[in-house]
Regions:
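Conserved phosphate-donor/acceptor-positioning beta-strand/loop module used by diverse small-molecule
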Residues: 95-115
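ATP-binding Walker
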Residues: 13
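Glycine-rich phosphate-binding loop used to anchor ATP phosphates in small-molecule kinases
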Residues: 52-96
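Conserved substrate/cofactor phosphate-moiety recognition/catalytic segment
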Residues: 19-62
Length: 164
């Protein structure tokens, strides 16, 4: 049986870092960052582009699920609404897969510190802080396993995920 990990969280919580390390820890694993399916300039949020990114994500995840080379599929994306998670899961062929839905959690103070450091390094723009902070509480109500990232390094977070 395969396992697919859906890892959500607000911008800057550490989804990509955790997912990359999880990929190294799990055998026969593959990783998809949802941002790779919608990397455009200018970034346009319309009904058409939202439908397109969902098709892109589900096509790739189903390709991984059907590929015999992979046992563990890791997907990360913001996924701040239950409807997004549900649409992805309902579009996947999970008959031979265990689905683990995770939300990486953080408090506002620590999120601001992480994002400010990213801004200082030129990785993110200034406007990300308010947008990301506004989404923190949205993850509390999702049907996901909550993994707290505060005062933990990536290895501790991954170790916790590996026990699920």
């Amino acid at each position: 049986m395969k396992t697919i990990y859906l890892i959500g969280g607000t911008m800057g919580v550490g989804k990509t870092t955790v997912s990359q390390q999880l990929k190294k820890e799990l055998p026969n694993s593959v990783f998809l960052d949802g941002d790779w399916c919608w990397d455009a300039d200018p970034f346009q949020v319309t009904e058409e582009t939202k439908a397109m990114v969902m098709r892109n994500i589900c096509f790739l995840l189903n390709s991984f699920l059907h590929c015999t080379a992979y046992k563990n599929i890791i997907f990360c994306w913001v996924m701040h609404e239950q409807s997004i998670i549900d649409e992805i899961i309902n579009s996947l062929d999970t008959g031979n897969a265990r689905v683990i839905k995770i939300s990486l959690m953080i408090d506002e103070t620590n999120l601001r510190k992480r994002l400010s450091a990213d801004i200082a390094r030129g990785i993110r723009s200034n406007d990300v802080i308010d947008r990301s902070v506004a989404r923190i509480n949205m993850y509390q109500i999702l049907d996901t396993i909550k993994v707290d990232t505060v005062n933990k390094n990536v290895y501790e977070i991954v170790s916790e995920i590996l026990t699920l």
